[in-house]
Each structure stands twice: as structure tokens, then as C-alpha cells.
Amino acid sequence: MRCPTCKYNGTRVVDSRPADDGNSIRRRRECEKCGFRFTTFEKVEESPLIVVKKDGAREEFAREKVRRGLIRACEKRPVSAEQIEEIVNEVERELRNIGDSEIASDLIGEKVMNKLASLDEVAYVRFASVYRQFKDISVFVEELKDLMEKNKDR
């Protein structure tokens, strides 16, 4: 690996340990020429997930889009950035575990809604109203009734 300071091509690994819950390896390296120490991360390159949209268009899965939707739904709610990030991680992990390279956008939305329903009901309703594109108040009220019915069962 090339030294970021002197650009010499010879470095040695000083320390190596798992990082990111075992999903990557953190390595401390030292340049053999100038002695500069730096950190690198080694991670498995995963094949891209392709999202098949409702109109049939295909695009690469973007964690940032899921995160933005969650942030918007959770505005002014007692939901932390860590909780939002955990939902993004869980959704991506579940999608990858399916084993298909193409995933329907509906499945992503449903997974996010299921996670939000157990975390914060107001955020769930906000997300559902955008995701399901409620056309009028009656559809919105039906969704609220369903949510209240589910809560009675708990």
C-alpha cells in the first residue's frame, strides 16, 4: 500500500483487528521509508442491489434515500440518529439476505414501515402517507384505524 505522506509503495501492517461488527478489518500501517503511521479499512465489496421501481425503471439501491425518508418522517419526534441508522442497516441487511440482485421498491417501503410502526407511530403514519400516496382523508383514516387495531392486540 502506498504511503499517503511520501508516496513510497512499501508499508507494513503494525496492527489488525475486526471493525464494524466484524464486517471490516481495521489495519494500522507504517511506511517502511518515512515511518508515517496510518489506518486503512478492508471490507468485502458487495454486489449492488438493484431496485425495480413501480414503473419498471431500475436503479442502484441507495441507503441515503432510505435515510432521507426516515429523517423526514421522524422530524420533531423522539427518534435518535442512531435509531434511524439502525433501521437503514437492518433494512439493507434484510434485503441482501433475500439473495436476489433485484428488489421491488414496494418491499423496501414495507420493510421501512414495519420498522417505524414499532418505533414511533407518528413517524410511521408520516412515512406511510408519502409512501402509499394517500389520495384523500378517508384512506388516511383507514390507515390510522388499522394502526389503532394493531395496538389493541399488543
UniProtKB/Swiss-Prot annotation:
Keywords: ATP-binding, DNA-binding, Metal-binding, Nucleotide-binding, Repressor, Transcription, Transcription regulation, Zinc, Zinc-finger. PROSITE patterns: ATP_CONE (PS51161). This is Transcriptional repressor NrdR. Signal peptide: none annotated. GO terms for molecular function: ATP binding; DNA binding; zinc ion binding. Binds 1 zinc ion. Negatively regulates transcription of bacterial ribonucleotide reductase nrd genes and operons by binding to NrdR-boxes. Belongs to the NrdR family. It comes from Listeria innocua serovar 6a (strain ATCC BAA-680 / CLIP 11262). It comes from the Bacteria. PANTHER family: TRANSCRIPTIONAL REPRESSOR NRDR (PTHR30455:SF2). Its cofactor is Zn(2+). A zinc finger (unnamed) spans 3-34. Residues 49-139 form the ATP-cone domain. GO terms for biological process: negative regulation of DNA-templated transcription.
